[in-house]
């Protein structure tokens, strides 16, 4: 009797079902793919391919008002590059939160996250959605593995139609074309099975001739299952009908005492490793629309009017003539302005040659063009003041700065949306650290004083076994020039007002309670600590003075030998009616000193 082996949970039948499901998902987002590809053409100033032909003229002007909008918004996003900080929800978690706040910037820097942030903001502004991928890459860090934060092209991502949150999709697919030779080197069992896959993803219109005949689509299939009240994330990597990896097929644990991937899933956090950053959200889709979708109609109209105006200028600057067939004029010599003589046959009549008059355009057309340009500026919030320009009559520096700060509220709102997505990315990074960091790692961090410090990060020692609930606070690492200037001026004003004087700490703390600015809590802690140190110092000095003089504390006060009074009793300050210290006149003071010296008895 033959023994029948159990078939793996993920086989050929499951791959065929997944491929059919992927085709349905692709059909559901076909409209989004077309819009993203068209928007990319507008970004590259190739929108004339999407404008109907206007007559037989070959003149096609291209203005970059829409491009300027994207450039300005991207600059605002880079000024607000995020920096994470972990805040504990319980007193016992303060040490762990402080440690993760030091480790996270190192991981972001190792992933060159600033470039990922920049690239995704380009995509967000153009297409309306950018996607971050957070994975565990076993090949990093010399084979020890590390967290990988990558930019994911929305064209290569497929989700369930009708959902608004990627995490709520029943399945999620990521497709990427890979060279056949590379695949065979990594998976020799693919030899003879590659070439011309049954699924093709949407592609951009490249300048270069991109040949994909020797490439095959590698499909990453993510799906969730509910087991025991928790969501488990499973993962399948396949090409065609060949399974390369499947978590449900991994029934053996890699380490002794650990659970197999078939029970544990790919990641312990149970979430899809993709996070969408949407610019302008839409109902029924996790994607959105961008500035190209808002402004491309106005950009078309601007270029059409520019084309007509330039064509009119060219026609007016290039004289054309109505010529009778029997006028006897040598056309070649007449058209050549370098020929001093033009030969004719017979007599010349005025009706034989007449210039075509081109009527100049009215100023109304130029006003319409200017209004369309202003329409793009107003619609996108990219006014002149955002780029350093000022309105007529505004000359005060403070007024200009206030206008620039107020005009940036749209960018600040969009950046806050990106910060929310960034919190999800950081939370996923922390979960991967807990799951996969199994050995100490040496990291270079930034110390409290800005100097380089070196940290030996041991997850088994430094992190708790159970996940800790932390709040992720995101702040801009690079403040704008206006913000830096305002913070510096405020610090100088606080210094001049005596806020940092320990003797005035109680008054300064009272004033801080009514103020709101960045770093207020840190300043409050510093002033409280300085005031406490001063009180302890005064008490210690008083006790020492009593011990040295041998007098009782009350007698020391009466004789004026107070510990913090040097040179005898302290004279009170002379103040005006509102409490300000009166400034003394140097000449008058010298006169008083001479008079006192003369009148003192010898």
Model-assigned labels for residue ranges:
Residues 1-256, 260, 268, 313, ...:
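Extended, helix-rich architectural segments
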Residues 1-54, 124, 132, 138-142, ...:
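C-terminal anchoring/interaction modules
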Residues 237, 273-274:
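Well-ordered beta-strand positions
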């Amino acid at each position: 009797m033959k023994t029948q082996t159990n078939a793996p949970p993920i086989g050929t039948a499951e791959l065929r079902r997944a491929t059919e499901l992927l085709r349905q998902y692709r059909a559901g987002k076909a409209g989004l793919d077309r819009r993203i590809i068209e928007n990319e053409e507008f970004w590259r100033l190739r929108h004339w391919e999407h404008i109907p032909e206007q007559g037989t003229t070959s003149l096609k002007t291209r203005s970059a008002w829409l491009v300027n909008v994207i450039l300005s918004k991207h600059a605002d996003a880079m000024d607000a590059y995020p920096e994470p900080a972990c805040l504990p929800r319980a007193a016992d978690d303060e040490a762990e939160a402080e440690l993760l706040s030091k480790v996270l910037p190192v991981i972001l820097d190792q992933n060159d996250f600033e470039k990922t942030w920049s690239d995704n903001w380009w995509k967000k502004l153009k297409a309306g959605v950018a996607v971050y991928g957070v994975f565990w890459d076993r090949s990093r860090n010399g084979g020890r593995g590390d967290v990988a934060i990558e930019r994911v092209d929305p064209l290569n991502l497929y989700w369930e139609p009708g959902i608004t949150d990627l995490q709520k999709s029943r399945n999620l697919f990521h497709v990427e074309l890979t060279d056949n030779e590379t695949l065979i080197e990594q998976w020799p069992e693919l030899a003879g099975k590659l070439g011309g896959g049954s699924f093709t993803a949407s592609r951009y219109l490249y300048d270069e001739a991109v040949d994909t005949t020797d490439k095959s689509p590698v499909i990453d299939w993510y799906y969730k299952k509910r087991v025991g009240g928790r969501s488990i994330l499973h993962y399948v990597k396949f090409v065609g009908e060949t399974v390369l990896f499947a978590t449900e097929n991994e029934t053996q644990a890699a380490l002794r005492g650990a659970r197999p991937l078939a029970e544990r899933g790919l990641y312990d956090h149970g979430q899809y490793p993709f996070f969408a950053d949407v610019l302008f959200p839409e109902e029924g889709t996790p994607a959105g629309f961008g500035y190209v979708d808002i402004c491309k109609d106005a950009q078309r109209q601007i270029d059409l009017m520019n084309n007509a105006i330039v064509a009119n200028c060219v026609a007016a600057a290039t004289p054309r003539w109505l010529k009778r067939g029997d006028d006897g004029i040598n056309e070649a010599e007449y058209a050549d302005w370098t020929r001093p003589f033009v030969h004719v046959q017979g007599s010349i009549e005025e009706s034989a040659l007449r210039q075509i008059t081109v009527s100049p355009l009215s100023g109304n057309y130029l006003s319409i063009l200017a209004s369309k340009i202003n329409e793009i500026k107003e619609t996108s919030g990219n006014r002149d003041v955002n780029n350093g320009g000022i309105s007529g009559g505004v000359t005060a520096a403070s007024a200009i700065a206030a206008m620039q700060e107020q005009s940036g509220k749209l960018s600040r709102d969009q950046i806050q949306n990106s910060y929310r997505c960034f919190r999800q990315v950081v939370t996923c990074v922390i979960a991967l650290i807990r799951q996969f960091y199994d050995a100490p790692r040496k990291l270079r961090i930034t110390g409290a004083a800005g100097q380089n410090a070196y940290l030996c990060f041991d997850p088994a020692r430094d992190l708790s076994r159970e996940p800790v609930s932390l709040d992720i606070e995101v702040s801009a690492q690079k403040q704008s020039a206006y913000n830096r200037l305002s913070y510096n001026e405020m610090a100088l004003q606080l210094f001049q007002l005596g806020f940092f004087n320990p003797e005035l700490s109680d008054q300064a703390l009272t004033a801080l309670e009514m103020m709101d600015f960045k770093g207020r809590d840190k300043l409050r802690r510093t002033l409280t600590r300085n005031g406490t140190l001063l009180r302890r110092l005064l008490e210690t000095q008083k006790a020492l003075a009593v011990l040295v003089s041998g007098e009782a504390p009350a007698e020391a006060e009466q004789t004026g030998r107070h510990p913090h009074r040097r040179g005898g009793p302290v004279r009170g300050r002379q103040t005006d009616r509102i409490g300000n210290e009166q400034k003394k006149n140097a000449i008058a003071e010298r006169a008083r000193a001479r008079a006192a010296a003369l009148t003192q008895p010898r």
